[in-house]
Amino acid sequence: MKKIIEYPAEITFKTIFSRSDDIDAAIDEILIARGIAGSVTCAESRNGKFLSYTITAEFESETLLQNICGAISSITGFIMML
């Protein structure tokens, strides 16, 4: 059964990318353009081939959350979102 989230809600999700220098700026640009002030942390894989980003922010609606997730998944090098 799908958990019903009441918005606004603080949501945390993780994204994984192939290593690239432009990902930090692209994620920040997506969040800022939509008025989201959140926390973004980055961790490098052991061999340095991948970057994982943990994003925590308050989202006003599921539509906004889906819009941001869609935009982030369109960044070059995107592998998955959890």
Model regions: which residues?
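Long, contiguous binding/interaction regions
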Residues: 1-52, 56-82
